[in-house]
């Protein structure tokens, strides 16, 4: 478990309680989403508090937030665990993305500024460089920034929902596609290169101000990821909710 030493501010003073909550939440959330803390892992409050260098009061608040986000299960009177991965859950996450991302893209693409266009281009270039360097963490950062940049004008509530759905879906993508990849560590150049043609097509449509084409490329990109994740299961289940959402998007 990659937990940091006790956290202090710039003056070397211990963090305030509210800062400690945010610190613990952000670190644990990132470790859960990236699989550093594995699905089903038991979370010992005593151990976590000691490793994080904080008291159990802010830790419990951080864990409450993670429970509310669906990343941790259990309660404070019994054993707490990292939520297991469940392809039915992944199906629902993607169904929601299929429904919301076209709205976000349609709201954003016609409104993009030159700076925002440059930022989208830069994130694709960062992904391409990270793929060649087999740098999974750099790729993950650029990948997230690119896709959320496509919906940045959707409004705070929609964008916040899309960001949360993205983070939850990334947990599955990393687990099923990268950790189960040919080298088992998710850092092969091929795995990171694979989606780059699709990202370039999405980017080209965005830069051209073509929201309809950008949406079509993005939905196709998502369908490929959905299918790849489900194919890792034996036998592959049917992504029922996603299929309904895809059909509705096509009719719209």
Regions from the PLM with identified roles:
Residues 28, 58, 89, 146, ...:
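Hydrophobic alpha-helical segments typical of transmembrane helices
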Residues 11, 34, 106, 110, ...:
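General structural signal for alpha-helix termini and helix-helix connectors
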Residues 2-5, 133, 175-252:
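C-terminal all-alpha effector/ligand-binding and dimerization domain
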Residues 114-178, 198-201, 213-224:
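Conserved amphipathic alpha-helical segments that form helical-bundle/coiled-coil interaction surfaces
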Residues 27, 31, 96-99, 103, ...:
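Solvent-exposed, amphipathic alpha-helical segments
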Residues 1-110, 115, 226, 230-252:
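Short linear motifs at protein or domain termini
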Residues 73-74, 93-94, 99-102, 106, ...:
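Catalytic cores of transferase enzymes with a strong primary signal for eukaryotic protein kinases
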């Amino acid at each position: 478990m990659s937990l940091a030493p006790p956290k202090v501010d710039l003056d070397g003073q211990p963090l305030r309680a509210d800062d400690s909550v945010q610190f613990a939440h952000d670190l644990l959330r990132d470790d859960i989403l990236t699989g550093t803390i594995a699905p089903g892992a038991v979370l010992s409050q005593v151990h976590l508090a000691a490793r994080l260098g904080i008291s159990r009061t802010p830790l419990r608040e951080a864990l409450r937030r993670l429970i509310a986000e669906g990343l941790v299960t259990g309660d404070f009177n019994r054993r707490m665990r990292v939520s297991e991965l469940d392809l039915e859950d992944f199906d629902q996450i993607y169904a929601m993305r299929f429904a919301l991302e076209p709205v976000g893209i349609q709201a954003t693409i016609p409104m993009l500024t030159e700076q925002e266009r440059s930022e989208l281009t830069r994130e694709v270039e960062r992904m391409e460089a990270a793929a060649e360097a087999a740098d999974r963490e750099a790729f993950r950062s650029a990948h997230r920034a690119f896709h959320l940049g496509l919906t940045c004008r959707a409004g705070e509530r929609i964008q916040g929902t899309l960001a949360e759905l993205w983070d939850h879906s990334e947990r599955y993508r990393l687990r099923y596609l990268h950790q189960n990849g040919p080298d088992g560590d998710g850092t092969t150049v091929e795995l990171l290169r694979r989606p780059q043609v699709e990202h370039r097509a999405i980017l080209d449509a965005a830069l051209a101000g073509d929201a309809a084409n950008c949406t079509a490329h993005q939905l196709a990109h998502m369908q490929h990821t959905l299918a790849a994740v489900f194919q890792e299961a034996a036998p592959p289940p049917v992504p029922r909710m996603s299929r309904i959402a895809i059909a509705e998007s096509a009719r719209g």
